[in-house]
């Protein structure tokens, strides 16, 4: 359940790289318990914005606040209360899943049961499997599990379903929804519009380092239709994703 109390606050964030403005005065708030999406083409500024919020990159000006903590003033405190699932992970192929989770927990000095963490993402039965033997979807689940070892206040997901087939993508969606239902605040980036509609309470559309739209997915679609916009193709009640899922089954194959 979301509340109006913001857990993420961005105020006039700016970041310049020589003659390129990556982030140009971005401001927004993310409510506690909300799933907030950032949409935009490559180079739009969404990744830089996320990195500033995570404390991985300094803004030239503006403020980034996570759970009341100014990121620039105390990045260590911020990193202790966030979980970060990266788009690409460098896990050791020969390590077992429980070993990987335990390793990351030690980095946070978190006292956890690796199997319990794996159970949150449905991988407890694979605790002794080696990373190299996982499917693409299972590797994404593990990367999310690792981001949960410190019981984060905010979970950052960077394109969590990139490269996955429709079956695996739906499984990751179900996992994100489950984490959200347990009260976590989630901020994610994605290139999949259907993913944003499925997961996000609100989305910000970014272009050239600026937010050009911010609302719920339904409201953004309604606003577009009110302009008289007509889709080029007839809108169908099903998609090719649905055809694929119907033919092959919804369960992720190992």
Place the predicted regions along the sequence by residue.
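Conserved ABC ATPase signature
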Residues: 130-134
